[in-house]
Amino acid sequence: MRNSRLLLPMAAASATAGITAAAYFPAIFLFILFLLIILIKTRHAFLIIVCFFSFILFFVLYAVTDSQNVSSYRQGTYQFKAVIDTIPKIDGDRMSMMVETPDKEKWAAAYRIQSAGEKEQLLYIEPGMSCELTGTLEEPNHATVPGAFDYNEYLYRQHIHWNYSVTSIQNCSEPENFKYKVLSLRKHIISFTNSLLPPDSTGIVQALTVGDRFYVEDEVLTAYQKLGVVHLLAISGLHVGILTAGLFYIMIRLGITREKASILLLLFLPLYVMLTGAAPSVLRAALMSGVYLAGSLVKWRVRSATAICLSYIVLLLFNPYHLFEAGFQLSFAVSFSLILSSSIFQQVKTSLGQLTIVSLIAQLGSLPILLYHFHQFSIISVPMNMLMVPFYTFCILPGAVAGVLLLSLSASFGRLFFSWFDLLISWINRLITNIADVDVFTIMIAHPAPVLLFLFTVTIILLLMAIEKRSLSQLMVTGGICCTVMFLLFIYPCLSSEGEVDMIDIGQGDSMFVGAPHQRGRVLIDTGGTLSYSSEPWREKQHPFSLGEKVLIPFLTAKGIKQLDALILTHADQDHIGEAEILLKHHKVKRLVIPKGFVSEPKDEKVLQAAREEGVAIEEVKRGDVLQIKDLQFHVLSPEAPDPASKNNSSLVLWMETGGMSWILTGDLEKEGEQEVMNVFPNIKADVLKVGHHGSKGSTGEEFIQQLQPKTAIISAGKNNRYHHPHQKVLQLLQRHSIRVLRTDQNGTIQYRYKNRVGTFSVYPPYDTSDITETN
């Protein structure tokens, strides 16, 4: 049939359009445009019917799936026998897992371990066990900072609606379901390798054998991600291809017929998917292998495009939410790009040339997705893949698999093998982290405008088509357009005339970002931070939570900010400077500004030492100084000299004018400090007050409010914080003076956006803000 080869690809594209249109209705217009292009290009009625049917099917499928994605439970305390649905993860004194209720609803459960002895006992809990659990249901947190990971949305797309804070685990019985037997085997391999492997090897070997990256060090994993080689630590088509080809060869050599070998492999693949964690890349590779094997059984020669389109459609039929997963998108985008460009590889005769083309096309195919989800890519991703892919394929991957098999046969020989293998892994990890540490290799782009991203994706497709046709004229035109769009994506923030002030929701602490129009000044005032206490060794976490890593750096990255023009620290309390070292070590700061007398204790010196090590200029300021940071100007109102009796009253107090409004930023200033500011500046006024010390009763005096006459007060405080900030007396005072109050603990990140001295307050995450959004 004419154009028959287009049926499955067009059906897959229409399925994508249907799900996207159901989730984001304006996408329906793109589908109409898509149908018009098919009509003009092919005039093939049957193809249009197939596309339309696929679109309607997946539109309805997503709508029905989403409407049924609700919970039958309410917030409160529940006790019943639940099934442990995943391998429990123990990190320090916390155990986390998914549990399944008697009516098959799944929850994200977490348990605080009480003692080292209990921790040892919990290691024996297996997936599939039924345990009597008692705990409280709480709603998962939404992302309250732009760019940060949205845990609520992540769970929602797994049909999970609750966090279950478990207080008691009792009477666990053995699993019976076969699926859980496979998961128990996976857990056994993880525990087995944890106990016998050297630290550097453990995480890498587990990632390559069972698809678990939990024990890969955070620094190493981040480095792999920055350089665009993190796919090496995922079970992918390469692993599945090598495994199926190897097993097929062994079975043929053992005298098993090709048909029986294919059937055995078809039975084996689902087990392998469960054993390796069922990540999108594994599902895609296993399904494609299954299509090839099934085709061989019925004497049907399956084309690669057919296999990948069938796999894509089947996965979306089972779970349309897959479409919105970064891993799913990357796996299929790269595979589609390589399959559609297969004729290019055949024209290149040398292995090095083919490796170069494969790396280049994979990079091009993944680039729009990388920019959308992660806002950055490495310019040396192609050469790094050319170097690392063969090395992992022929050395690290076989070594990891062989080492685990050897370890299971003989612990002594296995340890001997891993003693040298660990040296190799350590050397590779150091190489990767050192290269990733070179900032010049990373290109960072602000969250792309949808129109520019769509245009960029289209130009990449046209560029790949031009490469395949070997048309120099088309290649020059599409390559030029592609580079132009890429350049526009890169400079887009510099073209924007919008400025901003953001009070970032970092819990019980302070962190404010001030950005001038056209990126002419990017300043962070304080970093927030969590109080750390010394604890027993068994409570120490392998992956401790970091506001800098999980909140501030993603926030800056989403804005395309590779480096701040200045980091201003108001005073040396942990909840204001706790993440400064992380920002400095990630090369995020050009200039560090501190108040006079910043160091009052030996521990306060740590931040300054980190700045010196990174070559960051340190500037000490006092009352009367004016900070000029490109187009941003800050007037220093306090301190004149440090207050030996109070760190809070030694806070750096700043006054600025931006977006047509005057702002006073008070750090943790208390009433005594406020009085001193009024004495020195008796005519000081401010439209916006950043309330001192998170709204404690020791700050924000009546005289200060009467003097400033603010219209808006911003309070940064943690949700349900132990200090009960902000204090009711402060809130009542602000209410008496008819001052609008915006709070991070209730509203999330508080945003002020302005153009030409006219601005608007809003909050993140956005919702009906008619009561707080107001144009200046």
UniProtKB/Swiss-Prot annotation:
Query: Transmembrane segments in this chain: where?
Result: 19-39, 45-65, 232-252, 263-283, 308-328, 352-372, 387-407, 416-436, 443-463, 475-495
One BP annotation, GO: establishment of competence for transformation
GO cellular component term of the entry, any: plasma membrane
Q: Supply the CDD domains for this chain.
A: ComA-like_MBL-fold
A matching Pfam family: Lactamase_B
Q: Where in the cell is it found?
A: Cell membrane
SUPFAM superfamilies the record matches = Metallo-hydrolase/oxidoreductase
Q: Which domain of life is it from?
A: Bacteria
Q: What is its main location?
A: membrane
Instruction: Keyword check for Zinc, yes or no.
Output: no
Q: Which UniProt keywords apply?
A: Cell membrane, Competence, Membrane, Transmembrane, Transmembrane helix, Transport
Q: What induces it?
A: Expression activated by ComK.
What results from gene inactivation? Destabilization of ComFA.
The entry's function note states:
The comE operon is required for the binding and uptake of transforming DNA. ComEC is required for internalization but is dispensable for DNA binding.
Q: Which family does it belong to?
A: To H.influenzae REC2, N.gonorrhoeae ComA and E.coli YcaI.
- What is the protein name for this chain? ComE operon protein 3
> What phylogenetic lineage does the species belong to?
Bacteria, Bacillati, Bacillota, Bacilli, Bacillales
State the encoding gene: comEC
